[in-house]
From Swiss-Prot:
Keywords attached to this entry: Metal-binding, Ribonucleoprotein, Ribosomal protein, RNA-binding, rRNA-binding, Zinc
Gene name linked to the record: rpsZ
Protein name: Small ribosomal subunit protein uS14
Family: Belongs to the universal ribosomal protein uS14 family. Zinc-binding uS14 subfamily.
Cited Gene3D superfamilies: 30s Ribosomal Protein S14, Chain N
Annotated Zn(2+) binding sites: C24, C27, C40, C43
Length: 61
């Protein structure tokens, strides 16, 4: 419930531009955000493992 209200509040114009927080496009999580993909680490891993993000492969060395 608290996450939904934070997401709704994030849609309104902010008083200060510094307080803008990046959020995951899928789940709304604010921590572990990957800017290049617009996703949190959990959603990124899920989509990468299922092959939905083109060009992303598991690292092996």
């Amino acid at each position: 419930m608290a996450r939904k209200s934070k997401i709704e509040r994030a849609k309104y114009p902010a008083k200060f531009k510094v307080r803008v927080r990046n959020r995951c496009k899928m789940c709304g999580r604010s921590r572990g955000y990957l800017r290049d993909f617009g996703l949190c680490r959990i959603c990124f891993r899920f989509l990468a493992n299922s092959g939905k993000i083109p060009g992303v492969v598991k690292a092996s060395w």
